[in-house]
């Protein structure tokens, strides 16, 4: 199957890239990095994000959104990753997704138009830190309409107008400035975001009426897809910058990029990044279309993207030589963002374990047959997963 962006998605991609190139480049990112006490949410950027419809991409038209779907949202996420762009775009989009998936008509009418327009900002707390991306790992407990628990590493909680919190009985809306809510800023390695610990002590929670384990799992999968696309955006930018630099960096009287060992390594990295891009884009399509292999596609995409981004940003630092290790160079922006997102909504090991479970379940159910000519492998989005091993590796021809 040939899968590619349609014309609307390509136009969106060009528009996002153009804005970030011309109006919010790496120097603007550096200004956020150099102001760790600030809120990490530049007003000019939020205005553009709101006005250009990047927040409305998943909100249905009947609620003042544009309803372009998860592939279009992934296009935006990929561009934001490439630019290491700060701000609560992801949290706001996921808050809107929670309301869209599980909210009542009244809840949708109240929140979706405001979130789509950027009039309200969102933050989400869906998992305990380090836990696998499953509904049973909710960070809060609900009791009679109130929530308790410590929510760790919540991005942009300080500027949010609404928190979406997962508890054992589903998703809840919480007023960040309400009684029983204490928000404490945390020091972050990656200064392209702001994180906080949110303590809930009997805080009022408005349950999203259609919450269920299935809905929470879908929200977690959608979050993982967007993070995977952010990671492949980081990886592609790291590879591109490295190739351009090594064309001009001279050692032993010639550009280092002309040495065979470096050329071969960067060629291999290009293949890996391309595979990760295809896997992440296909996962977005599979989830949006409700395909049977959607869960498998999500875990392949997230694990592959995390591994590839880690390799790409590490190589970026190494192949830039001494300057790549300095604060003045932007390589550490990408490295720190990739490291943070590597663990968001399930790390590579957790997603490979999920891949293994899904493939074993299929095999037990007879859906994979006896392995046959493919040697017990299945292919999703151009990336092959070995049956029962949970390993996502390689690309099919």
Residue ranges: model-predicted function:
Residues 1-83, 114, 118, 221-397:
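Alpha-helical interface subdomain recognition
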Residues 25-162, 166-184, 356-359:
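Glycine-rich flavin
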Residues 1-5, 17-24, 64-68, 87, ...:
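Short, exposed beta-strand "edge-strand" segments with a Pro/Gly-rich flavor and a Y/T-containing core
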Residues 106, 113-240, 244, 362, ...:
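FAD-binding core of flavoproteins
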